[in-house]
Regions:
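Hydrophobic helix-and-loop "lid/oligomerization" segment in the mid-to-C-terminal part
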Residues: 2-3, 9, 14, 109-190
Length: 190
């Protein structure tokens, strides 16, 4: 969601956004119209643009020719948006982010990248809802608010600058506190 949002904003496609759970979209709990651009979530009839990288959506809905945008198998939805709007020529500042997003989303990470994440991979882990950091409620701002803030940060700041933001640093602290427990669990059960 974060990389897709940063790319879409940089391309001038969006000026506001909402992060929604895929099931909420499928169940019709989120209103969608022709002004909406959906990314990395299931297709909803009536949206203006749709980008996805999950082949299951085409199989489920037989969508060929029914939408504007692009959907195909790729390492990440961000990769599809990146290429759709011009790739490296349009987004030269996003090379490192794109490499990390593709790795994190597709799971093509080395053991060292999982055990000792740095840079964009660490940012990806911190912002992925599956990491579970959202259940710690003592953060200054919510994970949702941080996601909103980071859409612009990803476009204008280096990874070092992003990782130094107070709202990110407090999440790194919690993440690192949990690292030893994680390492013990991985070594015990793999």
């Amino acid at each position: 969601g974060l990389a897709c949002g940063a790319l879409l904003k940089e391309a001038g496609v969006i000026d506001h956004w909402k992060f929604a759970h895929p099931k909420d979209l499928q169940d019709g709990l989120v209103e969608v119209n022709e002004d909406d651009c959906l990314a990395n979530v299931p297709y909803v009839e009536g949206c203006g643009l749709w980008f996805d990288h999950h082949s299951s959506e085409h199989e489920r809905l037989e969508l060929a020719g029914k939408y504007k945008g692009e959907s195909r198998t790729a390492p990440s939805c961000a990769r599809i948006i990146y290429e759709y709007y011009g790739g490296k020529e349009r987004f030269p500042q996003f090379d490192d982010m794109m490499e990390a997003v593709d790795k994190v989303d597709s799971g093509h990470l080395t053991i060292d990248e999982v055990m000792n994440p740095k840079g964009w991979i660490l940012i990806g882990f911190l912002m992925d809802p599956r990491t579970g950091l959202g259940r710690w409620r003592e953060f200054t701002i919510s994970n949702y608010q941080l996601m909103e803030k980071l859409i612009d940060a990803c476009r204008t700041m280096t990874t070092a600058e992003i990782l130094a933001l107070p709202d990110v640093k407090e999440r790194i602290e919690v993440y690192n506190e949990q690292t030893e427990k994680f390492k013990q669990m991985v070594s015990q059960y793999t």
